[in-house]
Amino acid sequence: EKTADCFDAEMAKNADLITQVRCYADIEKNIAEGKMSAMLTVEDGVPLEGKLERLDAMYARGVRLITLTWNHENSLGFPNKTAPDKGLKPFGIEALARMNELGIIADSSHMSDAGFWDLVKYSKKPFVASHSDAKALCNIYRNLTDDMLRALASKGGVTGLNFEAAFLVEHTNYTRVEDLVRHARHIADVAGVETVALGSDFDGISATLEFKDCAGLPMLEEGLNKVFTAREVDLITHGNALRVIKDCIG
């Protein structure tokens, strides 16, 4: 609740530049007015504590995406790092159905492999891996296999490129644009360009980046332009994410 209060305060302080969105129409309104959009999200379903009424309360507060697990077990499921073979718990399946009904996007990043496949099985709406890369290019537990990428595409979802160097190239701590482009190209080749989005995770990574914050994203766009068409770059940078938001939250 304190974090949400902080979010509200930031929105109020910068209302001329950015406003909270609760539905796709809010995003369209902000675009028309030249404003940025901010969507309240939760990383880790631990605050739910097995209670659907808390999910309803989060929705009423404006939450529109929940990363189901983080780096530890919770009432929904298990993290990939320690329990890759354990899927969604019964409450996780129940909560997913309620999220689909309400219009809250389910995020599989950090979730166990088995939990990912349960999302494929049980979700009635697209879901996302908000900050995960291609395991075929960097074999780390947090990345997605080619089969996962194809399954994500079949659900109409996206994976957001994670800018953490260790997720892009093994044994490095420097994030290069060319490595991000390489992962984007692989994901597009395997699952279609409609499955690629930007995840960044600027506030959650320890790597040194070729560009340090979102002000440097034009560097990434320039790199993407070398291997994708202009239409495809538009999809990767914003179009795919907007489609999923529209499909999921209405």
Task: Annotate each language-model stretch with its function.
Residues T69, G199, G239:
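Conserved residues at the C-terminal ends of beta-strands
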